[in-house]
């Protein structure tokens, strides 16, 4: 009975399970057949990415700017290091006019000597070139100008001469030019250190005279031979093309050889031939700039070429000899000696002023806004008076010494 009851129980449970499974299947089928399946959730709208669109443009701009600055930097390096070796770039130096003072050699011939970075001339060579005062000359000298600064020469100004081409400029102007160049500012003729030999020592230059034996030998020359008397010519040059040719003619006061055979003139570019008949001839040795170097403007159509070239020539004679032969139209030895002593003492004056401290003008300021009275310090005024007295005594002594040497 127990077994039959168990069988009955299992059969009842199985039947109940079958019925329940059938009901669930029917509900699922009905549900799936009557209602549609749920739709998937919509995808979010795509957002526009501004960063991704700007990235290519930014990259292009950065690349262009990088290339531009790189080229600029390379160009600056080229100008700084390469061009300066050719002598065409100015740089600063401690002199008066912002041009570098290079040391260690000078430009000689076609190459650079001593490791110089430009084609300028050594400072010692520049300072050895002759100088003279413009006020020591007379004649048609009004309106003459410096070809570098285009300023007219004043009587108190100091000029420096280039011995070969015999062009004169302000000392500051030509020194500044020659610090970076090795040629004349006008004719571009090369200035070599050997040019100093054309001038030599000023004292020996002006004190040189014929001895009696030499004068006798000159007077006893046989007929038919010519005697060469050196003629000294030192020229100033100006850049005013509109100046009258009459003012730019050669300043020359010729002296007769018969009157005083002892007097003569040294020459840089020509010699004076005097034959036995007493006639004088001037023979050029082609050192003049216009004769030596053909300018590019030679192709210009000029009606009167000689008068045009005469506008750019102005010669100044430096003569030596007896005191009676000294002329106001010439640069005298005393002028050069006085000039050199004055230039040396001017440097001493600057040194004394520097030792006395930074002197400031005693008085009110220029703008009159501060109202602060500026006074001298460190005893600058007594030092200046002492230096002035020393300079005056030295100049008087040098002038007397030069006058006695000329006599």
Swiss-Prot record:
SMART domains per the UniProt record, alphabetical: RING
Highest taxon, organism lineage: Eukaryota
Transmembrane residue ranges: 57-77
Pfam families for this protein: zf-RING_2
Record field: catalytic activity: S-ubiquitinyl-[E2 ubiquitin-conjugating enzyme]-L-cysteine + [acceptor protein]-L-lysine = [E2 ubiquitin-conjugating enzyme]-L-cysteine + N(6)-ubiquitinyl-[acceptor protein]-L-lysine
Any GO BP annotation: protein ubiquitination
Pathway entry: Protein modification; protein ubiquitination
Keyword entries, A-Z: Membrane, Metal-binding, Signal, Transferase, Transmembrane, Transmembrane helix, Ubl conjugation pathway, Zinc, Zinc-finger
Protein name, entry field: RING-H2 finger protein ATL43
Origin species: Arabidopsis thaliana (Mouse-ear cress)
